[in-house]
UniProtKB/Swiss-Prot annotation:
Annotated family: Belongs to the UPF0231 family.
Matching InterPro entries: UPF0231
UniProt name for this protein: UPF0231 protein APJL_0987
HAMAP family: UPF0231 (MF_01053)
Coiled coil: none
Annotated source species: Actinobacillus pleuropneumoniae serotype 3 (strain JL03)
Lineage: superkingdom: Bacteria
Pfam families with a match to the protein in the record: UPF0231
Amino acid sequence: MEYQFTHSIHGVVAKCSMDHEAFARWLNTEITENPKELINIFAEIEKCRAAYPNHYECVFEGKEYSLFLDCDEVMVKANNLDDAFDESQMEDGFQFYDQESIAFCGLEDFENFLKAYQKFSKTYH
């Protein structure tokens, strides 16, 4: 998972590689408004590790994106992705674009992403 953080007049902005764009969108919309939520997320990451090899999962439901954690994988998904969508209504040759709506990564990669965000935020904000 590749990512980059920049600082603008609006604060810290995250950008992620193509397959992980939803993580950046989640961070930019859900966490920048409530950075203290990271404390709860890190606590749940530790619970995931402590539960291994047993199954443990946790969900953080946000306004636009939800975060799903388990022992092996992290998923970020746009809340509107579950809305009913009729593909038969689309014109021929078109596909529904959801690259920025859902993404997956490993628990360790996700934790490193959040720690890098915290470090960047403390240094440049």
